[in-house]
Amino acid sequence: MNPNQKIITIGSICMVVGIISLILQIGNIISIWVSHSIQTGNQNHPETCNQSIITYENNTWVNQTYVNISNTNVVAGQDATSVILTGNSSLCPISGWAIYSKDNGIRIGSKGDVFVIREPFISCSHLECRTFFLTQGALLNDKHSNGTVKDRSPYRTLMSCPVGEAPSPYNSRFESVAWSASACHDGMGWLTIGISGPDNGAVAVLKYNGIITDTIKSWRNNILRTQESECACVNGSCFTIMTDGPSNGQASYKILKIEKGKVTKSIELNAPNYHYEECSCYPDTGKVMCVCRDNWHGSNRPWVSFDQNLDYQIGYICSGVFGDNPRPNDGTGSCGPVSSNGANGIKGFSFRYDNGVWIGRTKSTSSRSGFEMIWDPNGWTETDSSFSVRQDIVAITDWSGYSGSFVQHPELTGLDCMRPCFWVELIRGQPKENTIWTSGSSISFCGVNSDTVGWSWPDGAELPFSIDK
């Protein structure tokens, strides 16, 4: 082979090797692209149903211990356009209560980072339900939890997290600086109401979708306060009740109509000899019903019902099945305040069904322990103490606390009625237990017209914690 032939042969071999290498590289790129398409296709494959849920794990390490802080559900393929929650539906017919959520916050907080809280409540939009709560600016099992039995301080804030999750710095959203609060969704945005400041001049700050839209100054300079549960929205307007004045005597009560975070109308109730605090409100057939706490002289609960023009009616639940705590043993009720054991009280709720009423109450008549749901078929208007259904929620040997109502609108559930729900606060720590702190977890239930069961769903944390020893 002469030199020219050698050069041609070597060049041909190099060219063939180069072409083969190029083909292999192109094949590698195609393989990677196909593999990536298959993986992302599996994660985002559209289903035949209306929505798919993609779950992302949010994990952390605490003191070398692996803690699963939360599972965040991202709704995919669902129309997230705004709707107006009309509130025109009636309450769904129900036969009992199915457990909806339990956050186990105190149990998890013995090792994980969980907020010291009280006054939790739940509110739902047309897309999700969230737990709102008042933090103490501290974590469980930490030195700053000391003295958190105090109700009002500059460190308290309203925050929220997905319902059923323990409230932690990793899954919670700041809402407002507040030691008294309310929140609700009108279908277009979240309204939050946070009250903070000194007892003799507190101010309520209203936010709509996180932006300050209005403020309300204390008008009696005596601990302006609000619901500690969700406000109620009807046809784009949201409604709340505020109290200012003595906790053990005649105070002043106002209904406020709020649109996109701005107060558009308010009235002061003409309610002599009535006492309204910490009302639990819900929409029903275009009106709003609120069942409240009488901390002055009633062991039964006062109520106020009003329309969108704030024309209102007032009364007390007549049933001899009393709903407050402390309270006397069940007996003869009254459509006015029942004075026996009427001083002091606890936040609570009831749901009216024509002349009947579902009453939520502690099992104990004197301490904040146990919880049960009672159906009194004529208790809204009659004073006897007979009832037909009792469903156990928390045993009398376990601590309970505040309770309140919330609803799930048809725009969320797909039902043609308003689903009634309630939450129960499970208080732990001071003043009843040997700790340096006060906090709570929560459970919630929703009304169903199918099988349910009575049981006890207590907080379940073993106290004291290491910080208490």
Curated annotation (Swiss-Prot):
- Residue ranges of the region described as Involved in apical transport and lipid raft association: 11-33
Q: Where does Ca(2+) bind?
A: D294, G298, D324, N344
Q: What does the entry report regarding how activity is regulated? A: Inhibited by the neuraminidase inhibitors zanamivir (Relenza) and oseltamivir (Tamiflu). These drugs interfere with the release of progeny virus from infected cells and are effective against all influenza strains. Resistance to neuraminidase inhibitors is quite rare.
Query: Which Pfam families does the record match to this protein?
Result: Neur
Query: Where do transmembrane segments lie in this chain?
Result: 7-27
Q: What keywords tag this UniProt record?
A: Calcium, Disulfide bond, Glycoprotein, Glycosidase, Host cell membrane, Host membrane, Hydrolase, Membrane, Metal-binding, Signal-anchor, Transmembrane, Transmembrane helix, Virion
Task: Return the cofactor note field.
Answer: Binds 1 Ca(2+) ion per subunit.
The listed locations are:
Virion membrane; Host apical cell membrane
- The enzyme's first-digit EC class, named in words, is hydrolase
Please name the GO terms of the biological process aspect recorded for this protein, alphabetically.
Answer: carbohydrate metabolic process; viral budding from plasma membrane
Which stretches of sequence are listed as region Hypervariable stalk region?
Answer: 36-90
Q: Where does substrate bind?
A: R118, R152, E277, E278, R293, R368
Per the record, ranges on the Intravirion side are: 1-6
Give any Gene Ontology cellular component. Answer: membrane
- Enzyme Commission code: 3.2.1.18
Q: What is the UniProt domain comment for this protein?
A: Intact N-terminus is essential for virion morphogenesis. Possesses two apical sorting signals, one in the ectodomain, which is likely to be a glycan, and the other in the transmembrane domain. The transmembrane domain also plays a role in lipid raft association.
Q: Which family does it belong to?
A: Belongs to the glycosyl hydrolase 34 family.
| Record's function text | Catalyzes the removal of terminal sialic acid residues from viral and cellular glycoconjugates. Cleaves off the terminal sialic acids on the glycosylated HA during virus budding to facilitate virus release. Additionally helps virus spread through the circulation by further removing sialic acids from the cell surface. These cleavages prevent self-aggregation and ensure the efficient spread of the progeny virus from cell to cell. Otherwise, infection would be limited to one round of replication.
User: How the protein assembles, per its UniProt entry?
Assistant: Homotetramer.
Q: Could you tell me what this protein is called?
A: Neuraminidase
Name the lineage. Viruses, Riboviria, Orthornavirae, Negarnaviricota, Polyploviricotina
